[in-house]
Amino acid sequence: MSDSINFVSFNQDYSCVSVGTPQGYKIYNCDPFGKCFSKADGGMGIVEMLFCTSLIAVVGMGDQPQNSPRRLKIVNTKRQSTICELTFPTAVLGVRLNRQRLVVLLQDQIYIYDISNMKLVHTIETSPNPGAVCALSASSSDNNNYLVYPFPAPSSTAFNPGENNINDSSPNRKGDVTIFDCNSLQPVNVVEAHKTPLACLSLNSDGTLLATASDKGTIIRVFSVPKAQKLYEFRRGTYPAQIFSINFNLASNLMAVSSATETVHIFQLEAGVSSTPEVPQDTELAIPTRTPQQKGMASVFRKSSRSLGKGLAGAVGSYLPQTFTGMWEPLRDFAFIKQTSLPGTRSVVSVTSTNPPQVLVVTLEGYFYQYTLDLEKGGECDLIRQYSLLDNVEGSLYGP
């Protein structure tokens, strides 16, 4: 179809939207809305930007020999030239970028490149990850350049310090998240996020907060990075739904979530306030002792420390005991959007830093929506503008 969309994504500061179509790819500016680049280059399944620079990463759909889904192209849109091409053993399922690292996700591998020279610096063996569940912090500072991905399933290979694979013999770790330092190229912690497999991960702009959702999609949790302390627990809904997108605003006090339902939820995070009781500072890094009452916690510490090495013993001990994390009810949304898209339509969402803030929703149906968010009252957001990303529909469909 000439008027269909394969892929949509925001750039790292939510100022642009990249679009992949059966004909090629397009870049749109969010405010003011408008197309700023397009190229007919065959079907594109992944189009990721590096902030507002002319550097983009594209992966084809395989409709043409030069657009193999195993081939990643780094393109300079200003010069309209290909900087380099990288070919992988299997299809590329996801791409993440910041100013220091390019991360490429395959079915069971993650490749990390130095973006300044496109040299491979690290490879991580993972469990099968067909959904490319992963997040890379937009910040590439020395302290907060983190990559997060599902903790590998148990295998016969144990973790050895200095190697790039983490494995653990403990069962039921499908909902755990690995925090990986992209500067030191070492795992630094494991987050016990959910009991069921992960569906979506998101890091805030400075790499200090991690949002997680499982394949149930009813609960969204927010953890500190890299300490892995649970800070918030939000309820999206009562019935399971696939989570498509989670994004913090740049100030990290609002978080938007889209799913296979018609509702987009906006949650409020207040500075210094969490939905779980605080633990004294000396308790946070304490190493649990094995007593009958703390057997489960000690087991987590013992197994996790075996996986991550002795240097992480204190960090793994920062997991909050169940008696703390289970005492508070999850918080509900602060504001919401009722979408007009068909149920199940994939979408990505973000919250702007404007005053008042706006919620941006982009769908695979090919529409870009702008909603106003009332920070005082919350509640349902008002649609102010709607645009089409399709070539056969031009201009604003709603609003001025």
Curated annotation (Swiss-Prot):
GO terms for biological process: autophagy of mitochondrion; glycophagy; nucleophagy; pexophagy; protein localization to phagophore assembly site; protein transport. It comes from the Eukaryota. The keyword Transport applies. The gene is ATG18. SMART domains: WD40. This is Autophagy-related protein 18. PANTHER family: WD-REPEAT PROTEIN INTERACTING WITH PHOSPHOINOSIDES WIPI -RELATED (PTHR11227). It is found in: Preautophagosomal structure membrane; Vacuole membrane; Endosome membrane. Keywords: Autophagy, Endosome, Membrane, Protein transport, Repeat, Transport, Vacuole, WD repeat.
